[in-house]
Design a protein with these regions (language model features):
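Short linear motifs in intrinsically disordered/low-complexity regions
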Residues: 96-98, 140-142, 146, 230, ...
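A short, charged helix-loop
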Residues: 120-162
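Catalytic cores of large soluble enzymes that bind and process phosphate-bearing ligands
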Residues: 2, 6, 146, 204
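Acidic, proline/glycine-enriched N-terminal capping motif
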Residues: 1-133, 137, 276-287
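Short capping loops/turns at secondary-structure boundaries
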Residues: 96-100, 147, 170, 175
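Basic, nucleic-acid-binding surfaces and adjacent catalytic neighborhoods in DNA/RNA-processing proteins
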Residues: 22-50, 64, 157-287
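Short, mixed-charge, low-aromatic patches
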Residues: 108-116, 137-144, 163-171, 211, ...
Length: 287
């Protein structure tokens, strides 16, 4: 599933290609894929999104991102948010697959179309009436962006008895971290994912915030993690998966200490960690 790093890779690549240029909706796919209400509360009500809502005829003034959500903001105030879900792709490339296309735009002065596709159909698009409406919705639904999270911000939400891994996956607490980068960040910070939030002290919260930013920036620099579907906006696979220290490596030796990596299901997700490098403060005791 695309996480913050993959969405940021797409934003950075698309920015010079679409900002300042006009969009024309060339093709609209299944309406249920595009059925997302506007803002919090109405987001549960499916509604048809017409070409105007898809920024037909609009000039893109900027691209914004918070967490895993990407917004195209038009000069006339219209906003369209794209969520890639599990397998979504947003690319301006000649090799964008013809199947599972949900919206295709023609971009002025660009040879290739901009395509949003999602084979597994967990993604979608959401129109907003204005940038102010967008920010209100994001402030209501999303926590601080993980790429800029600070130690004090993270310490403020590290409360209660749930596992720190579960907290990192909560988009209302910190936006953008998913299963891959939660595992990688906890490893870099040396924190056992089973540690209770209340047991993570202020100094360790600062270390974890630093680790989150470091892991995400490294992933962005290397094009994001391509495990299956992720492609950059130019249709290329990322290389960040080659840097994974723990994610997907259960039973293999730790790259740092050589201990065999362990895994368990936490917060409904497979979680991998090193028993030698990641401290167990407040963690569940083994039975």
């Amino acid at each position: 599933m695309p996480e913050l790093a993959e969405i940021e890779v797409i934003r950075l690549a698309l920015e010079p290609l679409v900002v300042g240029r006009s969009l024309r909706v060339e093709e609209i796919g299944p309406h249920d894929m595009r059925a997302r209400g506007e803002g919090r509360g109405t987001g549960r009500t499916k509604a048809w999104i017409d070409a105007a809502g898809l920024l037909d005829g609009a000039r893109v003034s900027r691209l914004e991102r918070r967490g895993k959500r990407l917004a195209m903001v038009a000069a006339d105030g219209r906003v369209l948010v794209v969520q890639l879900g599990m397998s979504g792709q947003l690319m301006l490339a000649p090799d964008a697959a013809a199947t599972h296309r949900h919206v295709t735009w023609r971009v002025s002065r660009q040879r290739h179309p901009l395509v949003f596709r999602d084979p597994r159909r967990f993604g979608g698009v959401t129109p907003y009436a204005s940038p102010e409406t967008l920010r209100e919705a994001w402030d209501a639904d999303l926590g601080v962006d993980a790429l800029s999270v600070t130690g004090p911000q993270l310490a403020a939400v590290l409360r209660g008895t749930r596992f720190v891994k579960a907290l990192l996956l909560d988009q209302r607490a910190i936006a953008g971290v998913g299963n891959i980068y939660a595992d990688e960040s906890l490893f870099l910070a040396g924190i056992d994912p089973r540690t209770r939030c209340a047991k993570v002290g202020r100094s360790r919260a600062h270390e974890l915030a630093d680790a989150i930013r470091t892991v995400l920036r490294r992933a962005v620099r290397t094009g994001g993690s391509t495990l299956r579907d992720h492609r950059t906006a130019l249709g290329k696979p990322g290389q960040a998966q080659q840097l994974h220290a723990v994610y997907g490596r259960s039973g293999e030796p730790c790259v740092r200490c050589g201990a065999l990596l362990r895994s368990a299901t936490l917060a409904g997700r497979t979680t991998t960690w090193c028993p030698g490098c990641q401290r167990r403060s407040g963690a569940v005791q083994e039975g």
